[in-house]
Amino acid sequence: MKKPKTLAYHALKSIAQLEQVSDFHCVEGWSVADIKWEGFRFSEIVRLVKPEAQAAHVVFHSFGKTGSAPGGQDHYVESLPLSELLDPKREIMLVLNMNNNPLPEDHGAPLRLISPYDLGYKSIKYITRIEFAKEARPGWWTLANPIYPAVARVPKDRLRKR
C-alpha cells in the first residue's frame, strides 16, 4: 500500500456485514461450537486500501504490551498469507459482533480476526493495525512458544461436519 489508511470503528461498521456461525478451537484442546459472528471478509479491506502487488502476507497487530517480548515483539502479532485471507472456503472474517452483541472486550473488541479452520491463536484479538508484507512474519505465540507452529490448522478429528 503506497499510503497508509486509517479506518475508524464507524467506517468498519459501515462495511456490508455478514453473519457466519462457526466453531472456535483452542490450541489447548477445547472448542466452543456454533458461535455466531458478524463482520466482513478480508476482501473488503483489500478493496478499500489497494495493497501493493508484491504483498503476499498480512500482519495483524494487537493492542497492548505483553509481559515478555520474544523476538523483540512487545505486543501480539499474527501473520497469514493474503491468499488464505481471500479464499472464501477458509471462512476467515474480521468481526465486530459475537452472538448478536457487540464483540465483548474479553473476546477481542473492538475488532478481531476469526479463522475457523486454524487454532485459536491465529484468530488475533484487539486488532489495531493491519500491515501488508512481502514475507510472512512469525507471530508472538510462535516466537514465545516454539511448539506453536506458524501454520496452525485444526486437526481434522476436531472439525464437525456441517
Residue ranges, per PLM feature:
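A glycine-rich, hydrophobic loop/mini-helix early in the fold
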Residues: 1-37
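Short, solvent-exposed coil/turn linker segments
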Residues: 6-8, 41, 81
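A mature extracytoplasmic/lumenal domain signature
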Residues: 11, 28, 39, 62-64, ...
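Stable alpha-helical elements in mature extracytoplasmic
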Residues: 38-41, 45
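Extended, aromatic/histidine-rich regions of cofactor-dependent oxidoreductases associated
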Residues: 48-162
